[in-house]
Amino acid sequence: MFKSFFPDSRWFWLSVVAWSAVSIFVWYSFNTQLGAMLGLDLSNTEPVIGVGHFFTDSFTLFYLYYAISLALFALFWFQFTPNRWLAWSIFGSGLILFSTYFSVQVSVAINNWRRPFFDAVQNALTAGSTVTSKQLYGLLIQFAEVAFIAIVLFVLTRFFVSHFIFRWRTAMNDFYVSKWAKVRGIEGASQRVQEDTMRFASIMEELGVSMVEAVMTLFAFLPVLWELSKYVSELPIIGHIASPLFYASIAWSIFGTLLLAIVGIKLPGLEFKNQRVEAAYRKELVYGEDNTDRAQPITLKELFINVRKNYFKLYFHYMYFN
């Protein structure tokens, strides 16, 4: 699934992790110095309300740093192991990551907007308020600007992700078709090439971006939780710890991920077995269309019993997983 689209090297994913770690370390260790070299001021940490949130010196430096880091990583693999899908796999993945990060920052911008807006609404309802309608309308316009960016970004991201995933499916299709002589003996080989690549593409389109967005959301709001932790000194049951909201969010995310992984450990195997029993049942029906000796009631009943048993197992395991 992956070697057909991404560089076919055992070192690729290790290089992704290593380069990401190096890039993150350099950014958090030297971003102030890098900004000073470019004449950018990163000292202002006050949240900017409205679309200006995306055009601060800090964001400008990040955009430039991310683009250079991605370009250097891609340049290495273009030289090391060039292939047809390299541009789509690396630059496409990088663009999706950036778009997802930007969409999370839209949520941060809206979160920053809520405080002054609702403070203004609350003050407007008190006696002797100095809040004017112009101020309220100005805040509403700022929200509309951010919301417009969010809508446009969502539409463009989904459009690009659809094309990205179909290119991935094309790469998988070409890979398996080139090995058709070897895989044709596998039960339901035609379905594996056609349906499994389609299902994989659909799953990645629906869940892949959601997973990345969930991780990005966590990291985007960690600085907010760090600041809010100044006003919280302890957690229930646990007691006093430094920056409790910050560490509690990380611990809960890890705990929830591990819990779901353990609880759902049997589901992939059952889904795979489900494909096999469904394929066996369908294959017998197909044979019965051209051969009267096949697809007899007794045989079909036995095959469908296997389908039923596997589905009932799936229902049971999904019950406690859900």
Residue map of PLM features:
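Short helix-terminus and kink motifs of transmembrane alpha helices
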Residues: 32, 107-119, 154, 158, ...
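An intracellular "coupling" helix at the cytosolic face of ABC transporter transmembrane type-1 domains
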Residues: 199, 276, 280-283, 287-322
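Hydrophobic alpha-helical transmembrane segments of ABC transporter permease domains
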Residues: 138-141, 197-247
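Membrane-embedded alpha-helical bundles that form the substrate/pore pathway
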Residues: 107, 150-154, 158, 199-224, ...
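Transmembrane-helix motif of ABC transporter permease domains
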Residues: 10-19, 55-106, 126-166, 237-262, ...
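Juxtamembrane "helix exit" motif at the C-terminal ends of alpha-helical transmembrane segments
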Residues: 22-39, 74-79, 103-123, 127, ...
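Cytoplasmic coupling helices
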Residues: 163-174, 178, 248-293
